[in-house]
C-alpha cells in the first residue's frame, strides 16, 4: 500500500526525554534538545527541515518553522503521530511498572482518576513534578503521610 511505502521508505528518529530532564531543563529547552538529537540520529542527513512552530537553535541544516505545522505539512503531522504512538507505548510499559496509577486507562494525561491516584500514592519518578496539577496532588499525598 502507498501509505506503508511512505513510512517504510522514510527516515525518522524518535527520542525519549525523561520527566526528570523536562523538570530540570524546562519543556521548551527539552523539546529543542530532543529535536536536535532526533535530527542528529537520522540515518540520512536531511537537506532541509520543517519544524512545528519554532526555530531550533544550533542546527546547521536549513529549517523552516511552521506555526500549526502538524495541520499543514504532512511530514510534521507524521512526526506528531510517531511521537504520540511512541509515548503511548512507553506509558503502556510504565503501567506495568506502576499499576497503582491506572495508566492503561488515561495514558498518563491529567485526568481526575490520575490525579486521585497521585493523591493516594504520591508521584512516581516518571511524573513531571513541575506540572502544577501533579505538584498539588503530590503535596496532598505528602501531607496525608506526615505523622
Task: Outline where the language-model segments fall.
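RNase H-like, Mg2+-dependent phosphodiesterase core
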Residues: 1-4, 8-147
Amino acid at each position: 500500500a502507498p501509505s506503508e511505502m511512505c513510512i517504510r521508505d522514510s527516515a525518522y528518529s524518535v527520542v525519549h526525554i525523561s520527566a526528570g530532564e523536562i523538570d530540570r531543563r524546562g519543556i521548551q529547552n527539552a523539546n529543542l534538545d530532543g529535536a536536535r538529537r532526533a535530527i542528529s540520529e537520522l540515518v540520512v542527513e536531511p537537506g532541509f527541515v520543517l519544524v512545528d512552530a519554532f526555530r531550533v537553535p544550533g542546527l546547521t541544516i536549513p529549517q523552516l518553522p511552521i506555526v500549526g505545522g502538524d495541520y499543514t505539512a504532512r511530514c510534521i503531522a507524521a512526526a506528531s503521530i510517531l511521537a504520540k504512538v511512541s509515548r503511548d507505548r512507553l506509558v503502556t510499559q510504565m503501567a506495568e511498572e506502576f499499576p497503582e496509577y491506572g495508566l492503561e486507562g488515561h495514558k498518563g494525561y491529567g485526568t481526575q482518576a490520575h490525579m486521585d491516584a497521585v493523591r493516594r500514592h504520591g508521584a512516581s519518578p516518571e511524573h513531571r513534578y513541575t506540572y502544577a496539577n501533579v505538584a498539588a496532588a503530590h503535596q496532598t499525598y505528602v501531607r496525608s503521610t506526615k505523622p
